[in-house]
């Protein structure tokens, strides 16, 4: 009798262990990608090299799977955002940001070149790192509906060479999709490649942008139009709550009120502006930089101007010229490309 009970117990343990191995995020197992199709992105030569992890190479099948997951409400099943997909908020026509008033959401564009994510840099590393946070902590993805779906098991097998569907697998597929979200075909790019020319006003605006007159280029560096760093740009002189920015992560006084530099690519489409969405138009943003910067002990030194303090003092015409240039950063192809839209 005891032998039978012991045998049954051992069998149960083996069964539970097998199920755990099957369903856990088995990151140590190397997937079979021999049947996938490598995908090389068409990125201009003046862009930095893409950092693509060896264990999550870009493939046609992986990007297609990530795209489908991005647009599928099944991803939020049983989670805090039940019934919503990533794309329910991140609108392609708005450069994959969230339209509306209130807190601004950084757009899902050119994140393949980023190593710090979210306004305060709460997550650092690769796209896999930020999407692991999104999958596990934000969406709290339940993978059972994906495992029981009539199509997803085959899609995961084709894309990732795995017979399991885990949160780790979902993360990898989404990371490939996010690397596909590259905006590199604006008028600014066409001018840089000799395929177009600026109007006189756009050229004047570019001169302001890339000189000390506008002082934009120090943080919004070309070609990504962001340095992917953190700066206190003088939105306010006292800080509390979310407004402490990077300080909440590092505890360093120099980071008080500092937030990640957003890319200016497609900036004309991504209102409202600043981390808290306080500005509704580019005109308001330029007015702030021209004469509304507030001093604080952690104000970034790049915000000070010799002889003029913390104001740019742009004329109305200079402001208009600068805004004209900012509009050349709009990539109409990116925001209208059917290949980036819903697959459903």
Residue ranges with predicted function:
Residues 7-17:
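Bacterial N-terminal signal peptides
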Residues 1-5:
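Positively charged n-region of N-terminal signal peptides that target proteins for export
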Residues 21-344:
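Periplasmic c-type cytochrome electron-transfer domains
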């Amino acid at each position: 009798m005891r032998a039978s009970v012991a045998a049954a117990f051992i069998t149960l343990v083996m069964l539970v262990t097998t199920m755990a191995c099957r369903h856990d995020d088995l990151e140590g197992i190397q997937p079979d990608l021999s049947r996938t199709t490598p995908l090389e992105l068409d990125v201009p030569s003046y862009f930095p090299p893409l950092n693509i992890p060896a264990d999550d190479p870009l493939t046609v099948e992986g990007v297609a799977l990530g795209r489908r997951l991005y647009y599928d409400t099944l991803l939020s099943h049983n989670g805090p955002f039940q019934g919503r997909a990533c794309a329910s908020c991140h609108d392609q026509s708005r450069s994959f940001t969230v339209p509306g008033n209130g807190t601004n959401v950084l757009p899902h564009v050119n994140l393949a070149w980023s190593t710090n994510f979210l306004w305060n840099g709460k997550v650092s590393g690769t796209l896999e790192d930020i999407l692991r946070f999104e999958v596990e902590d934000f969406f709290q993805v339940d993978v059972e509906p994906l495992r029981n779906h009539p199509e997803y098991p085959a899609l995961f097998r084709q894309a990732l060479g795995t017979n399991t569907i885990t949160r780790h697998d979902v993360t990898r597929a989404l990371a490939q999709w996010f690397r596909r979200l590259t905006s590199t075909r604006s008028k600014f790019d066409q001018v840089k490649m000799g395929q177009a020319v600026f109007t006189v006003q756009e050229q004047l605006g570019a001169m302001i942008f890339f000189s000390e007159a506008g002082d934009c280029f120090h943080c919004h560096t070309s070609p990504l139009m962001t340095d992917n760093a953190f700066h206190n740009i003088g939105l306010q002189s006292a800080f509390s709550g979310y407004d402490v920015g990077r300080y909440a992560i590092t505890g360093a006084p120099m980071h008080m009120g500092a937030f990640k530099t957003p890319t200016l690519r497609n900036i004309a489409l991504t209102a409202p502006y600043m981390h808290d969405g306080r500005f509704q138009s580019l005109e308001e943003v330029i007015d702030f930089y021209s004469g509304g910067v507030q001093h604080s002990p952690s104000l970034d030194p790049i915000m000070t101007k010799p002889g003029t303090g913390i104001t740019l003092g742009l004329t109305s015409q200079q402001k208009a010229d600068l805004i004209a240039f900012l509009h050349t950063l709009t990539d109409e192809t990116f925001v209208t490309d059917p290949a980036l839209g819903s697959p459903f």
